[in-house]
Amino acid sequence: KGTFVNIGINQEWLNFGFRVKKSMFTFGITEKIKTRVDFPTDLFKVAFEGNGGQNLGYAFNFNFGLDVLHTREFAVGYSRSMLNEKLRVGGRLKYVRGLNVITTKSNDLIFTTDPNTFAYTVTADIEVNTSTPVLDSSLGVNNPTVLVLGSPKNGGFGIDLGASYELTDRITLSASIVDLGRVFWNDYTTNVKSRNPGATFTYRGIDINEYLGDSVQGSAGFEALTDTLQDVFALDTNSNSFSTGLLGEFYMGGNINLNDRHNAGILLYGSFYNRSFYPALTLSWNSQLGRILAVSGSYTISRSGFTNIGLGLAVNLGPEQFYIVGDNLIGTTVGNLQTVYVRFGWNHTFGRKKYQKQKSKQKNISKK
């Protein structure tokens, strides 16, 4: 188990849509960067506790990891209202252009001290795949199209699915699955892999008598040690193709409008990373303070802890909307921070007043 930091950036370059009766068609271009850095807990354990005492025989795993997925999505979406406007279902089909990727497939570096002989045993298994034409100038990428848009050989497809249902006039239920798909990396690839995955080296120390008594024998012993270390930690580099998932996520939630200005919600979130499942449950409160200002608060339970408090602020200036949301605010003050999310953005809306009038008119008709 390690401590990790997640950083996510979503930049929406273009998003527009139009309605045809009960159907909605959309098109969007979004740039996404998903980054995860894993810091091995055992690194801090051995630094503060050492490898002796109760840690004799303990297998320290210094499995530092780095994963970066940088893509640009071209999405076509469709949604439709059903059951008297109560149910809306939809989806988006996305062509995904891969721009940069660093994926750590294996990162085991295990260190053990034998409790009887005090010999050190080290096992290594490392495999990292990259394709970084935009970031790495050493690859000699001079094509401006590749630098801006990425290589056409690095691409894939994805899909988003979602639905919402108005259970009553005040309660809305929703569910969605996003970023299902894969990107295939065929250009500017680099693969670094252990030549002997899982190879083990045991170090029992050096017999000082060999060096004092026979310098030739001592030199040969040192060379043998060096050769063994090179065999265990040797890395091979090639340029094979590989693929990565889009790091899919799912959401299930409900929202209740207490009145026109206040609502409460519950959201179940889940994601998969490195063959592990990361769920989270969030309770939220949102209030509209006048026509300009909106505030929100949240409490989240996740694998990282039970003290995740979040706050949000939004300012509505006519067609311009500005917002900022942050969570795990307690962790930033008490010193046990593991993960913090900050989201901020700006929206410019078109035709909102006309749509709101049409929606209000439809509700008034349905109540008659």
Where are these regions (language model features)?
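Subset of outer-membrane beta-barrel
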Residues: 1-368
